[in-house]
Amino acid sequence: MMDFDKKGILARAKEAQASTVVMDEGLRAYMLKVYNYMATGILLTGIIALISFKMSVVTDSTGAITGFTNIGNALFFSGLKWIVMLAPLGIVFYMSFGINKMSASKAQTVFWVFAALMGLSLSWILLVYTGVSVARVFFITSATFGAMSLYGYTTKRDLTKLGSFLMMGLIGIIIASIVNIFMKSSMMYFVISILGVLIFVGLTAYDTQKIKNMYAVSDSGELLGKKAVMGALTLYLDFINLFIMLLRLFGQRR
């Protein structure tokens, strides 16, 4: 009887170990796909932003902006700028509410379109800040994001309660930002930027853990593909917003 129990225990232990190995390998592949999509999206955004900026401005031999092309006038000073600014937000809502009806390949395509439109909408950054300071803040953002995402992936602490607190904070700074459009307070602008950095640093860890916990071995390849795209979209938004908040604090204006 004892031998039978030992064999049963060993068999269950081996089965559990095998399941853990499958889970670990699948989770790593899933998270790698999320990060690859996100990184490619950011790269696409950066390329489109740079091309849009170069096509929009006229510069002298020193690189100083001396005027705008027809593209620049349309992109920065006409009604088109509102379409360019709001289109990515529309796509975020479209993906958030329509992902269940999409195929994984369509979700990827929509994500690439979103990243490209974000490049157009963020091209103003190169108009306001020097290229050197943009590059510097980008590397600071990358290091900060990487550290917090790693923490979110490896920590055993449940960050669910932190997520609720951060979402309330996010709503707060959105409202404050709208109010400050009319108040034009430099102090409020500074405070919003500080709080924004703290909130998106926290959201990076929280969202990484949430994306990790969404993985399930039993999911089909199609479902995992859509989860990876939505995870990439979430982390992309965390990265971009953290980048903008840090740029407000450390960016050097032209």
Predicted segments with their positions:
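A hydrophobic alpha-helical transmembrane-helix feature that marks the membrane cores
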Residues: 1-254
